[in-house]
Amino acid sequence: MTDEPIMSRLPIEDVLPALRRILTEGRNALLTAAPGAGKTTRVPLALLDEPWLDGKTLLMLEPRRLAARAAAHRMASTLGESVGGTVGYRMRLDTKVGPKTRIEVVTEGILARLLQQDPALSTYAIVLFDEFHERSLQADTGLALCLESQRLFRPDLRLLVMSATLDCGPVSDLLGQAPVIACDGRLFPVETRYLDQPLSGHLDVAVVQAIRRSLAQDQGSLLVFLPGMAEIRRVERKLLDLNLGSNILIAPLHGDLPQEAQDRAIAPTQPGTRKIVLATSIAETSLTIDGIRVVIDAGLLRVPRFDPRSGLTRLETIRVTQDSAEQRRGRAGRLEPGVCSRLWTSAEHQSLAPRRPPEMFDADLAPLLLELALWGTANPAELSWLTPPPAGAVAQARELLTGLGALNAEGQITAHGRQMAELPLHPRLAHMLLTSVPLQLTSLACELAALLSERDILRGPSGWRNADLRLRLDVLHGEHDYAGGATVDRSACQRVRRTADLWQQQLPKQANKRQADKQEDLQSVGLLLALAYPDRIAQRQQGNDARYLMANGRGALFANPDPLGSEDYLVIADLDGGTQWARIDLAAPVWLRDLETLYADKIQVVDEVLWDDTAQMVRATSQRRLGSLILSEQGLSKPDPSQIATALLQGIRRAGLDRLAWTPELRQWRARVAFLRRIEGQESRWPDRKSTRLNSSHERLSRMPSSA
């Protein structure tokens, strides 16, 4: 079910003696092993009896929950035990370890929690970073903190970085010139097929055609890589419409599925049954799905990318890299000779990037910066990084955390920031939960945070949109199976409730769990969201029901008609960054009076004197602003004369000098001056009547002091 089939000998066995020798010497190490070599589950078991463990535990990081659970189950099964004995795992909302556990498999975010609780990792002898080539933000951060722990507290702590594809030189240098151990060789050969011509037309149609061809000419079950859930659902519907037969099972596999559905997708099938697994990149590494002999790769990947200039994250669909394509190809050769059908040409393959850039370049760094501040590091440059955090993203993250009260002006963590860091949430949501305590809205805040952290509980048909978070809360409070044109995902609702209850338990004891009136709660949704997303408070633009201006100066819109489109003010919790206008995905209305109370200290009064192109006149107003939003304005009774002159000049520049009320006599004078200047040439003593020169003259006049 995980990294390799049960066999008497795997390729990794050949390098285990060298690995044991290096670790016995007390050194860090780097292990590269081809897919299927057996590193994920054989290496931890092979180190169990090493004397340098001295009663301590092995800690292994996996990039995904599914991979962590599967690896733990596989190792426990090899020992003839259940998970929670010698082998256990830890992840958010799910932990199975016991007093006899000696191997802990954890998701990458757990390592930072363990380090914050015990910077020396005193109960662990070694940390293994599996699939490090993925270069996730949490893995990079975990390695930097482990190196700091090793330097300050635990020189005997071993670090082992494991990967299938990795540029070894920089990693070896970071680990103190750590030896590199290479394990070559795949278990079984894989035939690779390319398209003759570049793919044209709809992706889902091409994928279904490739599946039908493979069912007809190849043996075994199929693993199909698709960029996201939307494509998985479309392909699944098309396959179901084909009535492929009772011996063909179709199994989606992605990170938002319940654990039971994920387990079904990777479980063995009955004899005579073939399975078609429709997966995202979740199946790319650390998993062996029993029976898979064919891989069909669409060659695409959907990734979140954070723009520090806008503070927004957008989802982008990108081409896979060569190392990622090789990982996917390897899924077909785990159990027997296999086939990999790539939906691109061999020429296109040569143009693919060798590997993806580290997540550090594309991530929101606010959680990282808060984690480092809790560690005691105000400046990320103080740590040893394989890839240092980009300065622009660090500056944006520091600005956000300072605004939320998590950091002081020197970048050091505050008491409020320490409380935020204790909650396993994005700093925005942690701030919302803590601030909800004095407002007596903790139950609602926990539900909101859970809704925003888990998958959407509503599933609509293609093109369906309803961004209102209040609708989801109403569904969560009731037992509806259908809401607003969408079906209700009951398993997602259960997970949201469980997550909300967990966070309620982690809040300070004075948190009020009153059973508030549900209608009153729904009216407070926008207020709570404004605590988490002050930069995304949005004001509807006049004359347009779909477009909003956010407090950060960015624009946002509803891609399709939405019930929220008539609200004067929204707080946008989730949006796709886009280019000029971001698409609103989740939001709630907020009352202006709540904003004026909540951010009274942030509202500025600005006097503005500007030229109005529409009215062709100077407008002088006093405005109350929240960021880029004009909450109210009124006319100025006594505007500054110099500002009026400047505004008039702006109007003249835009409309041109001909817009002025020239008399016939003045027009004749301009013509005579122009004639004389043309006769005398460049050295003429007569002024240039061109608009640019006259504008300049007017500007000089506007700077002259007015008479008393």
Stretches found by the model and what they are:
Residues M1-M432, K513-A516, D576:
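P-loop NTPase motor module signature
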Residues P258, Q270, D688-K690, P705:
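Residues that cap or delimit alpha-helices
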Residues R186, L195, P561-G565, A708:
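A short, sequence-level motif marking secondary-structure junctions
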Residues T41, S246-N247, P252, I296, ...:
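Second RecA-like catalytic domain
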Residues K690, L694-A708:
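Single conserved hydrophobic/aromatic residue that forms the stacking wall/gate
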